[in-house]
Design a protein with these regions (language model features):
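C-terminal capping alpha-helices of c-type cytochrome domains
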Residues: 82, 93-124
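Electrostatic cytochrome c docking/interface patches
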Residues: 14-34, 49-50
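Conserved beta-strand positions that form and line the central face of beta-propeller blades
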Residues: 65-66, 88-91
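Bacterial N-terminal signal peptides
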Residues: 6-15
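Bacterial N-terminal signal peptides that target proteins for export
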Residues: 1-7, 90
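The canonical Cys-X-X-Cys-His
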Residues: 31, 35-46, 105, 109
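Gly/Gly-Pro-rich "capping" loops immediately C-terminal to redox-active cysteine motifs
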Residues: 32, 44-80
Length: 124
């Protein structure tokens, strides 16, 4: 009986929103590190990154070329592009980017952002 009560308590704690938010923050933090290691070489800030340059040409300023600035990406979209590749971007096998790592990268790229409709702080 004590085991059942302990298991139930553990499930309730794991189901709490605070726990889910902490787990998501951990995935986002891991995803940021993985993105910097695996993706930023092509999709990072600065001149000469082929992924960013290609997206600048494709979108012509209508959508951010820097993936980290996009707010319209879904986890499914990130997974499709990484697994299938597109244009000059190669596909990545599960031996190159594991499913768990890809989930973390997707969590980072689709993380909630502060609302851009919030008023700017007044100048000092």
């Amino acid at each position: 009986m004590k085991t059942i009560a302990s298991a139930t308590l553990a499930l309730l704690l794991l189901a709490r929103p605070e726990t889910a938010n902490a787990q998501n923050r951990t995935a986002v933090d891991a995803g940021r590190d993985l993105y910097q290691y695996s993706c930023a070489i092509c999709h990072g800030r600065g001149p000469g990154n082929p992924g960013t340059v290609a997206l600048q040409a494709k979108y012509g300023g209508k959508s951010p070329a820097l993936l980290e600035d996009r707010t319209d990406l879904t986890a499914a979209t990130v997974r499709v592009f990484v697994r299938r590749g597109v244009s000059i971007m190669p596909f990545f096998r599960k031996t190159e980017v594991s499913d768990a790592d890809l989930d973390a990268i997707a969590a980072y790229l689709t993380r909630p952002r502060a609302s851009s409709s919030a008023p700017a702080a007044p100048p000092r």
